[in-house]
């Protein structure tokens, strides 16, 4: 093997060059190691990160999967840490069930988990618009916890019809490299990840979320429910809609009642020139001849 070929096997700069050029990562002046630049905590997150996975580097792993690995000698691969990530997926169907699940996850377990609204149109949860995830480090651990959570869901007054199952890795990785039961870690991948692990620095998020973020989060959940036709959100607004319904106008039919105040329908008499009360009437003036 030539010296040049040997250099190509560890040419980290070429692997990450598009991300450097786009400003997604920067090369630190003190030691030339790489830092991700776009990992700030969102101020309007869809998820309640109840307890985070210790040592989780998810923003980096997604960049590694999508942008870096295809440029390495190993080709596109699922990061080895992600192959060890087993998730219990819980599918609440309404905002009422989501709040009940949140309370259950906060009070009954100490497992790493999150729950919230599913905005990704391609995700399996999008059918129900809400979801919960419990993170596990092995299939064995995941299956043991799945049995426990299913039992608790079945015995819960609100969550007794909610589905739960076990999956491997992130949805995006399952889509990019289908059939997670066939994922493996090659020797080339190990070499690439060993090199990158040394060069990348991480700001791992702390567990939990502060009160001001949770306040906005719960408002976002309720607004999402209202926007997606989930009327159980009315239980959190004293039965009042968040968004005022439009006033509807229909021609008055002889012998019928006016529209219900609930749907704000106004019956208008067909008499020419009549304008309903509260509606401004526009008049057109003729210009005087000079």
State where each predicted segment sits.
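Histidine-centered divalent-metal-coordination microenvironment in nucleic-acid enzymes
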Residues: 122-138
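Catalytic-core elements of nucleic-acid end-processing and repair enzymes
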Residues: 110-111
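Charge-rich, low-complexity segments
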Residues: 1-103, 114-121, 182-185, 193-271
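Helix N-cap motif at beta-to-alpha junctions
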Residues: 94-95, 135-143
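Arg/Lys-rich low-complexity patches in intrinsically disordered regions that function as generic
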Residues: 282-289
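Conserved short beta-strand edge segments in small beta-sheet-based binding/regulatory domains
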Residues: 154-175
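Short amphipathic alpha-helices in soluble, non-transmembrane regions
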Residues: 102-105, 144-157
